[in-house]
Amino acid sequence: IFIDVTSLEVCSQDMIADICKAIPVMDGWRRTLPEGRLPEGGIENIRLFRTYTELYLRNHPDVNAPLDLIVTQKEATPYGIPVYVYFFIKDKAWASFERKQSDIFDHLMSIVPEFGLRIYQRP
């Protein structure tokens, strides 16, 4: 998923509260922070999206979570900031695998705006 560089920002407390209200799993994540406090200097919206992506996949019934599951961000390109997602689907039947993987990426792409981010689209 390529993220539009111009949509990156450090989240305000209000923005984080809105994200946690809209996406309950993120509120659970916030409660795991030491004393409920954010890291010094704040936290970026793309980092919250990566955190959400990992939580979503680890709890998805079709994902084989005990196997490698990696959500990583690479260097910015002319097409935006790539967020790579590596995971394994439990079902190995090709058609079912493709359908489940597509459903997961549909969800991830549709939730990007909740984090104040935009998917890069070439003009």
Locate predicted features.
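Structured, soluble regulatory/oligomerization domains located on the cytosolic or IMS-facing side
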Residues: 1-123
